[in-house]
Amino acid sequence: MDITIQHPWFKRALGSLYPSRLFDQFFGEGLFEYDLLPFLSSTISPYYRQSLFRTVLESGISEVRSDRDRFVIYLDVKHFSPEDLTVKVLDDYVEIHGKHSERQDDHGYISREFHRRYRLPSNVDQSAISCSLSADGMLTFSGPKIHSNMESSHSDRSIPVSREEKPTLAPSS
């Protein structure tokens, strides 16, 4: 059974109405009028329609899947290189940290940093966990599940991030 954890349906469909839209991982790329005043843009230009799913499709995707055989986390980290990322397993949690120093872009200078923490299922084999970064900036963290009644041993360790040359197919539900 494949379990996908996502935002509630009402938050996905009406994502542009929530102020938190400004603070997702799509930061630092400039703001549009509908980011600040979503109702004003439709009043001024009634023929202009922002996609209701823009938030989900274009912002930092974080998708967790847990099926019978493995546990997978997909995380959009397109602004970071493998050297900017740190992935650690600490007890029952995986912590992903990304930070890059100040860089110049079209609008000035920008620096980015994020922290994500996910709880690992107790039956994930922590010794076989892998992590890779695709060419399109999708970080894939995965670990196989143990099918016996034994629980996985817990240890604190860093997981190296390997670089893949091909893009990841976008995770789909």
Swiss-Prot record:
Residues 153-167 have a biased composition (Basic and acidic residues). The modification Phosphoserine is found at residues 45, 122. Zn(2+) 1 binds at residues 100, 102. Acetylation at Lys-99 may increase chaperone activity. Residues 144-173 are annotated as: Disordered. Zn(2+) 3 binds at residue 154. Residues 1-63 are annotated as: Required for complex formation with BFSP1 and BFSP2. The modification N-acetylmethionine is found at residue 1. The modification Deamidated asparagine is found at residue 123. The modification Deamidated glutamine is found at residues 6, 50. The modification N6-acetyllysine is found at residue 99. The keyword Transmembrane helix does not apply. GO terms for cellular component: cytoplasm; nucleus. One of its GO terms (molecular function) is unfolded protein binding. Glycans are attached at residue 162. Keywords: Acetylation, Chaperone, Cytoplasm, Eye lens protein, Glycoprotein, Metal-binding, Methylation, Nucleus, Phosphoprotein, Zinc. Zn(2+) 2 binds at residue 107. Its main location: cytoplasm. It is found in: Cytoplasm; Nucleus. Residues 52-164 form the sHSP domain. Pfam families: Crystallin, HSP20. GO terms for biological process: lens development in camera-type eye; negative regulation of apoptotic process; protein refolding; response to heat. Contributes to the transparency and refractive index of the lens. Acts as a chaperone, preventing aggregation of various proteins under a wide range of stress conditions. Required for the correct formation of lens intermediate filaments as part of a complex composed of BFSP1, BFSP2 and CRYAA. Belongs to the small heat shock protein (HSP20) family. Heteromer composed of three CRYAA and one CRYAB subunits. Inter-subunit bridging via zinc ions enhances stability, which is crucial as there is no protein turn over in the lens. Can also form homodimers and homotetramers (dimers of dimers) which serve as the building blocks of homooligomers. Within homooligomers, the zinc-binding motif is created from residues of 3 different molecules. His-100 and Glu-102 from one molecule are ligands of the zinc ion, and His-107 and His-154 residues from additional molecules complete the site with tetrahedral coordination geometry. This is Alpha-crystallin A chain.
